[in-house]
UniProtKB/Swiss-Prot annotation:
One of its GO terms (molecular function) is nickel cation binding. The gene is ureD. This is Urease accessory protein UreD. Belongs to the UreD family. HAMAP family: UreD (MF_01384). The keyword Cell cycle does not apply. One of its GO terms (cellular component) is cytoplasm. UreD, UreF and UreG form a complex that acts as a GTP-hydrolysis-dependent molecular chaperone, activating the urease apoprotein by helping to assemble the nickel containing metallocenter of UreC. The UreE protein probably delivers the nickel. It is found in: Cytoplasm. Its main location: cytoplasm. Pfam families: UreD (PF01774). It comes from the Bacteria. Required for maturation of urease via the functional incorporation of the urease nickel metallocenter. The keyword Chaperone applies.
Length: 274
């Protein structure tokens, strides 16, 4: 079965005090919606749309994103991404980002739902200049749990690399197989249908911020952890509530993003659920 071969190439530049997309090439099913500026001209919010409504076996999606110096870009998606399990061939998605000095990329897609039988492989590579930063998260639901579906076949692979000045800052490889062992093992899902990872990479995170990240997770019913990197921090979640996961990640994101002290967040991206 032939799937989509979609491409998206975005280039952002700093022009007269504003971050603007100066190149936006897209081929179906990927599309860039109109950019907007709820926080003012320096920070560009862009929404990447998948016009086919979900991924099916055989899809190959490639995205390349470049931020020129001083740009601030937040990229998200308009809704949950669905990976269907209808064909026994994998879906592959790759994302390669180049972030120049004094630029900040925020890669914050809404959650991904992996249907039973789906085979999904995502590769993410981010190259940072010495004074660049990136914030990113991934929220994944295994199976359509509202229908009682269990992720008992298929697989999910998530491979992330963040480099700065040619030095690896964070290499993260995760793999979940749709087997009983993976569903129940302590070092896998342990009966939880949700996993999430949030990272901020490219600068040192203070011990006070680390403690505040942990304090923000107080009262969470799922399991959480906060780990430091040489230049960054990683937060992880495993549990049953997407609302709980999203609430913690949004609070952590607001704490970590630069400029929050003097430039408080005006509003969430308009496509996010309230």
């Amino acid at each position: 079965m032939a799937g989509w071969l979609g491409e998206l190439e975005l280039v952002y530049a700093w022009r007269r005090g504003q971050t603007i997309p100066v190149r936006a090439y897209a081929s179906a099913p990927l599309k860039l919606q109109r950019s907007f500026y709820p926080e003012g001209k320096p920070i560009c919010h862009s929404v990447i749309l998948h016009t086919a409504g979900g991924y099916v076996g055989g899809d190959r999606l490639h995205q390349k994103i470049t931020l020129e110096p001083q740009c601030r870009v937040l990229l998200t998606t308009p809704a949950a991404t669905k990976v269907y399990g209808r064909a026994q061939i994998p879906v592959e998605q790759t994302l390669h980002c180049h972030v120049a000095d004094e630029a900040v990329l925020e890669w914050l897609p809404q959650e991904t739902i992996i249907f039973a039988g789906a085979q999904f492989h995502q590769r993410l590579r981010i190259d940072l200049a010495p004074q660049a930063q990136v914030g990113l998260w991934e929220m994944t639901r295994f199976g359509r749990t509202a229908r009682g579906e269990v992720f008992n076949r298929g697989y999910w692979r998530y491979h992330t690399e963040v480099w700065q000045g040619g030095v690896p800052l964070w290499i993260d490889r995760q793999r979940i197989e749709g087997t009983k062992m993976m569903l129940t093992a302590m070092n896998a899902l342990q009966g939880c249908p949700l996993m999430g990872t949030l990272a901020w990479v490219g600068r040192e995170v203070s011990s006070e911020q680390i403690q505040r990240l942990r304090d923000l997770a107080m009262g969470i019913q799922g399991e959480m952890g906060v780990s430091t990197l040489i230049r960054g921090v990683v937060c992880r979640y495993r549990g049953h509530s997407m609302a709980e996961l999203r609430r913690w990640f949004v609070a952590a994101w607001q704490l970590l993003r630069p400029g929050q002290g003097s430039h408080p967040l005006v509003c969430y991206p308009r496509v996010w659920p309230r």
